[in-house]
A protein has these predicted regions:
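Conserved GTP-binding G-domain of TRAFAC-class P-loop NTPases and closely related GTPase folds
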Residues: 134-196
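Short hydrophobic/aromatic beta-strand immediately N-terminal to the Walker A/P-loop
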Residues: 17-19
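Phosphate-binding P-loop
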Residues: 11-15, 91-92
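Conserved substrate/cofactor phosphate-moiety recognition/catalytic segment
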Residues: 32-96, 108
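Conserved lysine of the Walker
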Residues: 28
């Protein structure tokens, strides 16, 4: 992980993009805070999504949603994705270095984004944060309560599905990003993050 940190601190003209990959609750935000990359723009669709849910007066406790709230959530996510896509597009046009804070659960979409970024002159990295399913589910379960209702929690089925996709993508992402791939493990067994 130190290699990634040093590369990002280099003062070069080529913009850099870091694509984060990890299941919900893996600790991607925790890892970012530890790297202290506060000078690099962070793009996260969840920020827009949470704002949209609040504006629609929908509880962020998504794991206990009513059918009516799930419908509102879908509308909020659709709008968040549109706004987020524009944010990413504008950032790329401006040649700004940035961190894409998400799960990267879709291998196909990640490959497309990586290609688009490289065509735009970016050096592209992936920071993959692994956690076991138990931690992912526990973090999701506790997220809403621990935040005092200010952060969202997902339905367990969504966490499980995303965890499976992200975990299956580890080797393909390692092969795709080669030397620009860094992975760490964040598990319940101890509080220390380990390089994979």
């Amino acid at each position: 992980m130190i290699k990634l940190y040093n590369l990002l601190l280099e003062q070069v003209s080529q913009p850099k993009a870091i694509i984060l990959s990890g299941a919900p609750g893996a600790g991607k935000g925790y890892v970012l805070k530890g790297l202290d990359l506060s000078n690099i723009k962070v793009l996260n669709v969840d920020n827009r999504y949470v704002d949209n849910l609040k504006q629609a007066n929908v509880s962020l406790d998504l794991k206990n949603s009513s059918p009516e709230d799930r419908s509102k959530q879908a509308i909020a996510m659709s709008q968040a994705n549109k706004d987020f896509d524009k944010d990413v597009e504008d950032t790329i046009k401006a040649k700004e270095s940035f961190i894409l804070d998400g799960t990267a659960a879709s291998y196909k979409k990640t490959v497309e984004l990586k290609n688009e970024l490289e065509e735009a002159g970016y050096e592209v990295f992936m920071l993959y944060v692994y956690t076991d399913l138990e931690r992912s589910l526990k973090q999701n379960q506790d997220r809403f309560e621990k935040s005092g209702g200010k952060d969202r929690s997902l339905m367990p089925a969504i966490v499980l599905s995303t965890w499976n996709k992200v975990t299956q993508n580890h080797k393909p992402y390692k092969d795709l990003f080669k030397d620009n791939f860094v992975s760490v493990a964040n598990t319940l067994k101890d509080e220390k993050i380990n390089d994979l």
